[in-house]
Amino acid sequence: MQIITDPIQMQAIAEKLRLNRQLIGVVMTMGALHEGHLSLIKEARKIAGTIILTIFVNPRQFAPHEDFHRYPRPFEQDAAHAKAAEVDYVFAPPVDAMYTGNFQTTVHPGPLGEQFEGKQRPGHFSGVATIVTKLLQITRPHIAVFGEKDAQQLAVIKQLVKDLNIDVRIIEAPIIRDENGLAVSSRNIYLSAKERDAATVLYKGLCHAERRIAEPCLDLDAIVPEVENIIKSALSCHPEYICFVDDETFLPASKAEKGKTYRLLLAVQAGTVRLIDNRKFMV
């Protein structure tokens, strides 16, 4: 495994791999690797012969009041995990290598990036879209694997690749959960034992929605307050948004139609930690 920090060097390696007809898969992370990230690497390995793991805590997707400076950066541990997962290249550039002093260009994802997470975190998806575009240009992958955990991010990236005619196939990987149903996340380390226990209401809410839709209940608006009550049953959990969307368009959905797929999106403040989760439903 090679660790590369220079974007120009990484791009040259990727171009050489392509010339040698190597199928490249990329997994983009901000480090603090966990089982969810490792599952993305496994998915990439099913298709690609060469795996590039990117580790970059992107300042442009954090608001000034968010946790950029305290975001975990255990690089040596991450490198060990990457090596054990048989990653071929770790691309871990410094911030000034990705955003030079006169850097001016930003990729704006449009309305898709302005709702839900985009509304709660203005500018977040512009930062995501910009860094994903740059990393795709640098690593030159044939496939890129992203987790369903960040469902709106996945939708933004799919739209970006389509709109900008970027020659890469986006692969979705399922959410990895712990034994209590909590979706694994690098930010889970911020949770106290009490907050972690309380946060299981997110999964309980998603499971309740699944049961209701299976009945079938096609009135999605009727399910939302039921899920809200489940989440609020944990006194430390405060919902920011609970919304069903059409999984194809990502537009809010009030009534379900048979044969279509929907996704329930959750954002919850669990004590001091903000958590997001979601589940997909076929009606």
From Swiss-Prot:
GO terms for biological process: pantothenate biosynthetic process. It catalyses: (R)-pantoate + beta-alanine + ATP = (R)-pantothenate + AMP + diphosphate + H(+). Its EC number is 6.3.2.1. Coiled coil: none annotated. It is found in: Cytoplasm. The active site is at H37. Catalyzes the condensation of pantoate with beta-alanine in an ATP-dependent reaction via a pantoyl-adenylate intermediate. This is Pantothenate synthetase. It comes from Chlorobium phaeobacteroides (strain DSM 266 / SMG 266 / 2430).
